[in-house]
Amino acid sequence: MIPVIALVGRPNVGKSTLFNRLTHTRDALVADFPGLTRDRKYGRAEVEGHEFIVIDTGGIDGTEDGVETKMAGQSLLAIEEADIVLFMVDARAGLMPADQGIAQHLRSREKATFLVANKTDGIDPDTATADFYSLGLGEVHAIAASHGRGVTQLIEDVMAPYMDAEEPEAELTDEEANAAYWAAQEADEDEIPEDEEDDFDPLSLPIKLAIVGRPNVGKSTLTNRILGEDRVVVYDMPGTTRDSIYIPMTRDEREYILIDTAGVRKRGKITEAVEKFSVIKTLQAIEDSNVVLLVIDARDGISDQDLSLLGFILNSGRSLVIAVNKWDGMSEEARAQVKDMLDLRLGFVDFARIHFISALHGSGVGNLFESIQEAYDCSTKRVGTSLLTRIMQMAEEDHQPPLVRGRRVKLKYAHAGGYNPPIVVIHGNQVTDLSDSYKRYLMNYFRRSLKVMGTPIRIQFKEGENPFAGKRNTLTPNQMRKRKRLMSHLKKGK
């Protein structure tokens, strides 16, 4: 499960600056759900290959009401949701009474907590952070969030328990590296690598289906409708996290695991809207799924929350099916307006199937599974190197790559780089310098050629590194002697 990091601290210590720094490392869309989450912000980030969800909370000021009262709002909930807490303090302002109150609360919680002193740029970090050791939270990590200094090292320290131990790679000498480079270049020119053996059988595993959406769009009704049709007893699988309910079921001789993010089995026990709609629960369910079923209320249209969820789904690379619920009872004119609005606002996800359903009455629900099955099959379909290379060559013939610094980009071969989502890796010369428009052209060409529906497709570009880049030629002893004789001859001529 992808870890969750919460940023807490007094106002104006740089929490939002660090949040933006982290979520922009891969231009992740920030999922912002005002009101429902009490103005907390959620984002997906990656630093040095480590992925995580980060929560930005409002500031906590130690007023006369007490820190505990302020904590009972957004920050306390964020701490409870998080696996890791980054307690941020202002190195320039020094230790404040509110910092001590927050630290006292954090020490009482069984959470991995890291003390982060921000705004250390331009000052001596050792001197500025000395007072914070009295908070009793261990080492103080000095950073400058606005400039990014120390942020990468901080995340590596924080994520250390979640990283698999990696064996260090043996370093090659310059001669070995040069020989390996040219050997690889010759191999690339002469032959296309063979496909590796893959024993993975997607049909042997159940499809993990996450049903997500805003509150009151009909997620629970749809879940009960699906389960009611199959007469499967609902129960909670042990070991599930964040209270998402994992429900095994079988449909058309195919096994599924339904991930119900609504978490509502007995309506009488739900007392707060926040309890019904946990953003973290939803985001982690998306990460854990193979296919995401996004439920939209036809009467409310596409809201900013829907687009935020949609952005997170796309960023996660999960397969997608869209269900427009509460379609029954709408007039033909209203239905036409909804369809026009969907075409306008969802044009960027043209690969996703859209179904118009009524979870309450069951109309259209059965057809959802055809698209779910199609999306899963497309995302896990194995495609050989020869076919991918042939498609790449056809795309190149139809539309030549543009010139880069006066030279034509050369596409050598393509192979599969991963699944769910499908990843195509293209090797060649100067491929990393291709324009964004040509990269989109290649992505759409592969999608059409492979008939991929219901899942995003990603294109990665790789080119061999030139071992001589940035190096100066060194003259041999013989060349040095010739150069010396030439220089002496020129001096005599003067």
From Swiss-Prot:
Keyword Zinc: no
Endpoints of the signal sequence: none
Superkingdom of the organism of origin: Bacteria
Domain (EngA-type G) ranges: 3-166, 207-380
Gene Ontology BP annotations: ribosome biogenesis
Ranges where the KH-like domain occurs: 381-465
Pfam families cross-referenced by the UniProt entry: KH_dom-like, MMR_HSR1
Keywords: GTP-binding, Nucleotide-binding, Repeat, Ribosome biogenesis
Residues at which GTP 1 binds: 9-16, 56-60, 118-121
Gene Ontology molecular functions: GTP binding; ribosome binding
Cited CDD domains: EngA1 (cd01894), EngA2 (cd01895)
Sequence positions that bind GTP 2: 213-220, 260-264, 325-328
Family matches, as PANTHER family: GTPASE DER
Homology family: Belongs to the TRAFAC class TrmE-Era-EngA-EngB-Septin-like GTPase superfamily. EngA (Der) GTPase family.
NCBIfam families, per the entry: GTPase_EngA, small_GTP
Role description: GTPase that plays an essential role in the late steps of ribosome biogenesis.
Assembly and interaction partners: Associates with the 50S ribosomal subunit.
Name of the protein: GTPase Der
Lineage of origin: Bacteria, Pseudomonadati, Pseudomonadota, Gammaproteobacteria, Enterobacterales
Gene behind the chain: der
